[in-house]
């Protein structure tokens, strides 16, 4: 049976991604000085303006306007002709402390209040909710091919802009990849869509030629392309006005880009700007870690795990697994292995993945999962041998 599946990615200059990177830059700066700082930082951008808001409780000081300007400069919006300038944009901040009602549940979990705890029970989940983790062996990154390929194309767009290969490119851009599957395995790429912001001096014919030569051919293996592969490069014909001048941006608006490109389910919680006591982030990272190690251990070809939490309670209220018919054992047996090998209380996740560190801005663009260009703890295959002992 053949079917098509499509996923998209965006570059670091996309308005929503600018916001994610600013929020995580603030988080990293605080964790660097105060590893126990509590951060829920939201950012909005529009023409000529950045607003940073949220709830932050910390003993340290960080210069938020300076962080904002440095982040925007690093992305590439450093002159007015790009429609957004790190030096001249206004930066508005509105920061409160974390609610004492929320802090009360995170600081002392329900298990602690009832006297039925060990030390790791003392950290309660920062909110209720469910988080999903996913892995598949269809790529070496244990990621679905559509999102993995879309991320690589987006990253390459920024590379050729920054290294001067295509100097007329500007920071905003999007990619989209449609993969054809046969009996559950990727066999070819059916369509590639790339929209990239550019200077007014260049024509579409040049952009199409350059993107195919310096982006697509460099990233996509030739055996996945054929005479029927369709290419849509700047299909509107012109993309000069972009970034915050073209569209307003908000933190947390690219949650499918951040995860599995729609191939796996999503619990709805965004990542950027949240410290690791927020299970929206830490438990989603842990779920990816669990799923990837299970697939690498041969438990299934494709696996999704759901974790659910109650605010102020340390232990997950539920753990659920789906192997989509590819499991080498029952889903119930896999959940039993998860409970034996992994401790999924927030305090244990923070400890085992060493999450109270400034490691978040680097994943705020080009995906939080499947990253081989950086070392992030939730991508490590460090539980495979232990899992195999229980198979």
Curated annotation (Swiss-Prot):
InterPro entries: ADOMET_SYNTHASE_CS, S-AdoMet_synt_C, S-AdoMet_synt_central, S-AdoMet_synt_N, S-AdoMet_synthetase, S-AdoMet_synthetase_sfam. Its cofactor is Mg(2+); K(+). Its main location: cytoplasm. Its EC number is 2.5.1.6. ATP binds at residues 14, 172-174, 238-239, 247, 253-254, 270, 274. The keyword Cell membrane does not apply. SUPFAM superfamilies: S-adenosylmethionine synthetase (SSF55973). Coiled coil: none annotated. Mg(2+) binds at residue 16. K(+) binds at residue 42. One of its GO terms (biological process) is one-carbon metabolic process. Pathway: Amino-acid biosynthesis; S-adenosyl-L-methionine biosynthesis; S-adenosyl-L-methionine from L-methionine: step 1/1. One of its GO terms (molecular function) is magnesium ion binding. It is an enzyme of class 2 (transferase). Residues 98-108 are annotated as: Flexible loop. Homotetramer; dimer of dimers. Belongs to the AdoMet synthase family. This is S-adenosylmethionine synthase. The gene is metK.
């Amino acid at each position: 049976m053949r079917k098509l599946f499509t996923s998209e990615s965006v570059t670091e200059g996309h308005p929503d991604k600018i916001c994610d990177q600013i929020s995580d830059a603030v988080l990293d700066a605080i964790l660097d000085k105060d590893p126990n700082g509590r951060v829920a930082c939201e950012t909005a951008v529009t023409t000529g303006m950045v607003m940073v808001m949220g709830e932050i409780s910390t003993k340290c000081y960080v210069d938020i306007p300076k962080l904002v300007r440095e982040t925007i400069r690093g992305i590439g919006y450093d002159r007015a002709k790009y429609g957004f300038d790190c030096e001249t944009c206004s930066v508005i901040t509105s920061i409160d402390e974390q609610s004492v009602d929320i802090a009360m549940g995170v600081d002392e979990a329900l298990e602690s209040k009832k006297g039925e705890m060990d030390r790791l029970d003392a950290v309660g989940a920062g909110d209720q909710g469910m988080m999903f983790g996913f892995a598949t062996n269809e790529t070496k990154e244990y990621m679905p091919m559509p999102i993995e390929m879309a991320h690589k194309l987006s990253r390459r767009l920024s590379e050729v802009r920054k290294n001067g290969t295509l100097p007329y490119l500007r920071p905003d851009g999007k990619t989209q990849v449609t993969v054809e599957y046969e009996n559950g395995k990727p066999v070819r790429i059916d369509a590639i869509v790339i929209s990239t912001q550019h200077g007014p001096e260049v024509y579409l014919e040049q952009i199409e030629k350059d993107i195919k030569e310096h982006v697509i051919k460099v990233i996509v293996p030739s055996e996945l392309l054929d005479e029927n592969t369709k290419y849509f490069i700047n299909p509107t014909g012109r993309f000069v006005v972009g970034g915050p001048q073209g569209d307003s941006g908000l933190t947390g608006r690219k949650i499918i880009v951040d995860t599995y490109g729609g191939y796996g389910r999503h619990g709805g919680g965004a990542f950027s700007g949240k410290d690791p006591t927020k299970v929206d982030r830490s438990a989603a990272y842990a779920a990816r870690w669990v799923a990837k190690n299970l697939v690498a251990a041969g438990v299934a070809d494709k696996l999704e795990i759901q974790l659910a939490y109650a605010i102020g309670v340390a232990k997950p209220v539920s753990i659920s697994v789906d192997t989509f018919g590819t499991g080498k054992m029952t889903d119930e047996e896999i959940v039993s292995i998860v409970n034996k090998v992994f401790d999924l209380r927030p305090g244990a996740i923070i400890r085992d993945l060493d999450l109270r560190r400034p490691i978040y801005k680097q994943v705020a663009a080009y995906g939080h999962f499947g990253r081989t260009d950086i070392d992030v703890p939730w991508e490590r295959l460090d539980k495979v041998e232990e899992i195999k002992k229980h198979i």
